[in-house]
Amino acid sequence: MLTSLVGSEMCIRDSSNAITVSSVTSISMDPPSLLVCINKNSRIHNSLTVGSKFCINLLNKDQEDLSNICSDDDKYDQRFNDKNWNLDDVPFLANAQSNIFCSIENVTSFHTHSIIVGLVEDSKYKNEIKTLTYVDGEYS
């Protein structure tokens, strides 16, 4: 799974961030909300402020390479090279399985990570389900 984010001060491509996360959890349907945990040492962390926007992009099986790029700090500059990124506002991957657009409602610190609570504002999805999964250290 991949999340991309634009903080309140980040509106251009050079300020955009993307990171692969291993888990996104739904919290509630009323209001629709989810959480994601981000390591405090990651580059994206300091952009995660209340009121900023992000998008959870659930990847397709054929997007394993992009997932690996977004999890490798040595490939940081390659994260937005894919032609399917839409960078107009909150960056999202147009050909992902689904996109879940959120605004940050709460950020809670817990040891090495921050727990980010996002309120879902919009979503898009493909009808054909071919979602990339990561289980027991392997993609499937």
Residue locations for each model-derived region?
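Single conserved hydrophobic/aromatic residue that forms the stacking wall/gate
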Residues: 1-12
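Short beta-strand/strand-turn micro-motif
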Residues: 14-22, 99-102, 118
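A short mixed-secondary-structure module that forms the rim of ligand-binding clefts
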Residues: 19-62
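A residue-level detector for short acidic-glycine micro-motifs
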Residues: 23-26, 104-106, 122
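Short structured motifs
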Residues: 48, 84-88, 102-103
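Mid-chain, well-packed structural core segment of small domains
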Residues: 68-97
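Flexible glycine-rich active-site/ligand-binding loops centered on an Asp-His dyad
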Residues: 107-140
